[in-house]
Amino acid sequence: MINLKIVDNRHWRTTYMNSDYKVGDLIYDANIYDAMNTNLDDLYFYKRWLPKNKDARILELCCGTGRLTLPIAKEGYDITGVDYTPSMLAQAKMKASEAGLEISFIEADIRTLDLPE
């Protein structure tokens, strides 16, 4: 039997997850992330769930450096990537530009994300 302990995470949320302190930039280095995440074996799994209509809009949450966003955009889909870490988004934007892809990237906390229709 698994014994789980409930932890009060208010300190973490108020100290490290506010808009003034981007914890992701301290934890995640975009170059290291890319070096460690070169495998795209899971791309097939995600592509199976994509709509047949390539005009449909797709939202990728926690897109990081665009590991999945870019290959999906290359398939002709209109995809938007969202991430909270500025360095990850900068890397994703650079990679999209180098690939000649027009992809919208949004820096936001997905817990409070408010998108227009």
Name each model feature, range by range.
Residues 36, 62, 85:
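Anionic group-transfer/hydrolysis microenvironments
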Residues 69-112:
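Class I SAM-dependent methyltransferase SAM/SAH-binding core
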Residues 115-117:
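A short acidic, Gly/Pro-enriched loop at the edge of an enzyme's catalytic core
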Residues 44, 65, 71:
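Glycine/alanine-rich phosphate-binding loops at beta-alpha junctions
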Residues 4-6, 10-64:
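Conserved class I S-adenosyl-L-methionine
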